[in-house]
Amino acid sequence: MGLYNITYKNKETEKEINAEMGKPFGLIEKLKLGGIGSRRMIIENFSEDIKNLTLKVSGIQYANIELRPNGIIVHINQGIYTHAWTIPYFRLSVFNGDFFTIHGGGSHIQFNKEKSWKENKEFLQKIVK
């Protein structure tokens, strides 16, 4: 599990993410799965360790999720910066309560369940499978 700054393309960071999560799915796999990415979701809260590593940006923060062969990547958009949080499937826990929460390796991120929940419900069921 790692948190990477992917605002600018960096081949070393890309290699690390691919080694940890597996290479991105090819076109045929993407079609078979019915898509590998969520729509953007509104972030409600982070765990403290993610808050410390990411920027302090006021206003609404968004994230989307990408499926990979060995785990998921949560792309966190904060202003002009983008961070990628990699979570292997064996460390992934998903909770559905007042908020939709993803836990991995002792960290978590909470998403608002308003509009984005309805738009992403089908995709989020793929993660649970």
State what each model feature region is.
Residues 56-95:
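Phosphoinositide-binding peripheral membrane targeting modules
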